[in-house]
Amino acid sequence: MVRAKRKLDHIEYALSTGQSRTHGFHDIDFVHQSLPNSSYDTITCETKIGELSLSSPIFINAMTGGGGEQTLHINEQLAYVAKHHNLAMAVGSQMAALKDESESASYKVVRKVNPNGIFFANLGSEATVEQAERAVDMIEANALQIHLNVIQELTMPEGDRDFTGVLQRIEKIVLKSKVPVIVKEVGFGMSKETVQQLANIGITAIDIGGQGGTNFAAVENERRQRMLSYFNNWGIQTATSIIEATSTNNNLSFIASGGIQTALDVAKAIALGANTTAFAGYFLRILMQDGVENLVDEIDLLHTDLKFIMTALGVKTIEELQSVPLVVKGETYHWLAQRGIDTAHYSRR
């Protein structure tokens, strides 16, 4: 019951705290093309994460599950949206269902609603190989997300305090997994050093989960008597984290998440090197406040606007969008300069 109550608390506080930090995309400017030589009608938005082919560079990221009927209903509606738009979708952490079989229905519902969809299972980095296999089987997943949430755990009153051996546990899962493994942050971003460590153990897809979206330090602080307020602004902004990650020059697929709300955010993230983008808090807020059909309509608009932007930039595919010229400025530029990452090549492509 404690875990289920926490799941419901997370939904409540995620909606009430909102996106309290900046994602950094205001520091990214496209170089305008007056002669784009492009047509809206010829644009395609297919992309890939590793060997997984996706019809859109937008997918529904992990949000919830394991909190009884309310989380079942949320996942049921999200799966309906995913089916309508043919989007990939991740479920929230499945540890609740591994501990209590009665909670498995709140995850299994996604496959029931969308039998042919692309779904990602989800567990924390404390998971064992056996737990990872069970999570994948539970929803017949196409991939497995392993989330890294050190700051959330430290801020969580009942959270973990020991993070030794995490990389070794992930490596064991990678070696045994029958589906691709995606490692993701939960709103605090990934550094180039972290990305390199993950690449070294065979990870081929990473969700950088940057600062700018749902602030899980703030969410957990709402549940504490004594707030750890020093964690509320902790992390690497999403735009910065994408550049850090891609600077490692590994042959990896990158997912950009963390405050993504608009088609312009999507376009900038892809132009910085992401293969796809993931929405969570923004979609959840629309679903809970305005209803499922409004979320369906919003995703329609996102795709329309993304195609408008691609037309303006003179590109026809997501791969071409990854090579358009842009300028990195402001705080993002200064951070990257201090980290020894040259951004000039973006503006000279």
Swiss-Prot record:
Mg(2+) binds at residue 153. It catalyses: isopentenyl diphosphate = dimethylallyl diphosphate. FMN binds at residues 62-64, 93, 122, 184, 214, 258-259, 280-281. It comes from the Bacteria. The keyword Metal-binding applies. InterPro entries: Aldolase_TIM (IPR013785), FMN-dep_DH (IPR000262), IPdP_isomerase (IPR011179). One of its GO terms (biological process) is isoprenoid biosynthetic process. Keywords: Cytoplasm, Flavoprotein, FMN, Isomerase, Isoprene biosynthesis, Magnesium, Metal-binding, NADP. Its EC number is 5.3.3.2. Its cofactor is FMN; NADPH; Mg(2+). One of its GO terms (molecular function) is isopentenyl-diphosphate delta-isomerase activity. It is found in: Cytoplasm. GO terms for cellular component: cytoplasm. Homooctamer. Dimer of tetramers. This is Isopentenyl-diphosphate delta-isomerase. It comes from Bacillus mycoides (strain KBAB4).
